[in-house]
Amino acid sequence: MADANDQIPSVTDRVRPVATGASVVAVKFLGETAVFALGEETLLFASPDNAEQRVAVHAGGIMAVASDGKRILTGGDDGKVVATNAKGETETLGQDARHRWIDSVALGPDGVVAWSAGKQAFVRNAKGEIKSLDLPSSVGGLAFSPKGMRVAVAHYGGVTLWFPNAQAAPDMFAWKGSHLDVMFSPDGKFLVTTMQESTLHGWRLADAKDMRMSGYSAKVRSMAWTADGKWLATSGSEQLIMWPFGSKDGPMGKQPRMLIPYDKRAVAVACHPSQEVVAVGFEDGLVMLSRLEDGAEILAKKPGAAPVSALAWNASGSKLAFGTEDGEAGIVDLG
């Protein structure tokens, strides 16, 4: 990568700073409003008219965050699962009976939500009915299938594919090791997990064929699909790593693309909602944009004092929000 400060195009003059005053755990957009989930208790709403609103959603730390663009689902160390809408109105959807931390959350179709605590996963439907599943070890992550009512539950030893509305036993996709975050590909044909080791693992769901994606210098903490589902963007190395998923075999037998080489590790990625553009945050606070077609780069945020901890695009792709571990945050207007 060229010197990020003065040799490449920059949009840093289009950044609206947001004073969070706390570590940023995640950022999501509800309409045109960027919502920053802070380390302790609070969601910070930064609306387009420059107004800011803080909403306390947990009595303690926010451990997990998900959004479908209409509401934000959070899990806290207070054992609660809370949904917050664009008006800042909150609703408690779940309360762990043993007051365990809520480790992961996910939003599904038709108002369905999922969360985990310890070795249990829970699904709540729109009627408020809750079902649970016991797992062999602590849950690492949750994801809803883009097609049908299936929930992938990552844990030590693999991923359990759960059908909460069916009587059939869950399916197990086994691979030794501790599986953390889990994602379905947008077409529902592949399942990918990050692992405790510096690697990704995946399965082709049609035949449970294993896919191993390695070569990282650190644990992969962030991954995202491009809008067309043909590429998986990942952090975990001193560049952006893009795995090809455009064929029926996915990345099997193929090499990844590597973009934005840098001397610091990528720690956060977010794909543009309609174009082949990826935002990448690095451990020194730098945020870059990369266009897959030709590898062109744009500087969105200069390096700072702490790693990037959150990135998100709005639905149209005209705005990019970022946050860091020390609370530096902003919204880049690309419209």
Task: Report each predicted region and the residues it spans.
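WD40-repeat beta-propeller superdomains and closely related acidic/aromatic-rich repeat-like regions
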Residues: 1-335
